[in-house]
Amino acid sequence: MAHNEPITIDDAGDDFDAVEDNQAINEQYKVWKKNTPFLYDTVITHALTWPSLTCQWLPDITDVPDTDYTSQRLIIGTHTSGQANDHLIIAEVLLPKKGAGISDKALADLYDEEKQEIGSYTASPARIRAIQTINHAGEVNRARYMPQNPELIATKTVTGEVYVFDRTKHESKAPANGECKPDIRLKGQTKEGYGLSWNALKEGHILSASEDTTIGHWDIQGYSKQDPSLQPLRLYTGHSAYVADVEWHPKNENMFGSVSDDGQIMIWDTRSDNTAKASSQVQGHNAEINCISFAPSSEYLFLTGSSDNTIALWDLRKLSTKHHSFEAHTNDVLQLSWSPTSPVHFASASADRRVHIWDLDAIGAEQTPDDAEDGPPELLFVHGGHTSKVCDISWSPSSPWTIASASEDNILQVWEPSRHLRTPYEAEFDEKDLE
C-alpha cells in the first residue's frame, strides 16, 4: 500500500489484524525462547543478510582441532528480490561434539539469551559463516548436491533452467560483477519451480519439476565443455498443473514420484516409453500437494505434504489407500525430511512457522486427554523457533537428530531436540504393522 493512499475501513481492519497476528507471534516466540534450555541440546539461530529458500547439509564432518566442536557444511542460497546480486552459498556450521560431558544443569546455564543459542561449550568463532559464495542469476529456489560427488551442486532458477556448479572451479568469494557462470545449464523447461532430485543409484541423472507442468530428466554426463547446455533426455507431461516436487526412489534407479497442484501423486518408470502417462497415480489430497519424500530405509513407503495442512503416508503396493494422515500443522505443509539414521522418524516444515518431528511407531498409541490436547501420539516434537514460513529443512546425515531449517524472514536455525525428549522413542519400525 502506498503511503499517500487513504486507508479504507477494510484496509484498517486488515492492518489491525496484522498487528494482532504479529503480537501473537512475538508472544509465542518469547515463550519458546524461555523454554529453549529445557527442550534442546543445541540451538543456533543465525540471521542471514537475505532469506534462503533452500538448505541442505553436505555429507562431510571434520573435527576442529583443540576444540569441542565439529565442522559441518550447509548449502543455502539468497533471495534478494533484485536488490542485490544473488548467490549460492556454502556455509560452515560449528557444532558441539557428542559426549562432551556437559551436565543438563550446565547445558541450561550455557544458554546465551542474547544470541539465542544453547550448546556454546567453549569460546569460539562465529557458529555459522559463509565459506564460499558463487554468483547466481536470480534467487536460488532450491539447491541439491549430487550424492556421488557432493562438489557438484544443482540449483533451480527463476527462468526454468537448472544450473550445475562444480564448486571446486569457483573462487571462495564471488566476483563483484555478479556474472553467473554455471558449469552446466540444463534447458528444456520454461517456468520456475522447486522440485529437484539427483538419482542416488545412477550417477549424473537429475529430475526437475516445473510450473510449466513438466518434469525434466537429464544425464549431466552427456555434456561437453564446448557446449555446456543440455536438453532433457525426456520431458514427462502427465500432470495438468504446476508440478511442485519430484523425487527419485532411493532403492530403484528407474522409479520416481511426482506431486502437483492438481492433487495427483504419480509414480513413473523411466523404462516406459510413455512420457505422458505415469505407471500409476492416485488423487492424493483434495488440495495442492507440495512435497514428496520416499523413506530411505523402505522399498514401499513414502510421504506427501499438502496445502490441506496434512501429511499422508503411502505404500506403493496399495497406492489406492492412504495408510495414515498426520494432522497437526495449521497451514500448508511445504517440505519433508526423513531421519537418515532412524527408519521411524521424519520432519515436516510448514507455512504455520513450525517444524514437526513425527514417530511412525507411535501411530495409534493410547493417549490421556491431556496429552491429546498437545497433538496426536505420533507428534514427537514441535520446533517453534521461527516467526515466519519455514521454506526448507534438512536432517543432518552426520549428527543424528540435528536439523537445519530456513525461514523466509532471513533466519537459519540449526537445532537438536533434548535427548530426554527423544530417547524413549528411538525404536524399530516394522512395515508389516501397516498391513
UniProtKB/Swiss-Prot annotation:
Keyword terms of this UniProt record: Chromatin regulator, Cytoplasm, Nucleus, Repeat, WD repeat
Keyword match Glycoprotein: no
Keyword Metal-binding: no
Cited SMART domains: WD40
WD repeat ranges, renumbered to this chain: 135-175, 188-228, 238-278, 284-324, 328-368, 385-425
Domain of life: Eukaryota
Chain positions covered by the region annotation Interaction with the histone H4 N-terminus: 370-374
Site note Important for interaction with HAT1, residues: L301
Subcellular location, record wording: Cytoplasm; Nucleus
Family statement: Belongs to the WD repeat RBAP46/RBAP48/MSI1 family.
Function recorded in the entry: Regulatory subunit of the histone acetylase B (HAT-B) complex. The complex acetylates 'Lys-12' of histone H4 which is required for telomeric silencing.
Subunit structure as annotated in this protein's UniProt entry: Component of the HAT-B complex composed of at least HAT1 and HAT2. The HAT-B complex binds to histone H4 tail.
Name of protein: Histone acetyltransferase type B subunit 2
Provenance organism: Cryptococcus neoformans var. neoformans serotype D (strain JEC21 / ATCC MYA-565) (Filobasidiella neoformans)
Top-level taxonomy: Eukaryota, Fungi, Dikarya, Basidiomycota, Agaricomycotina
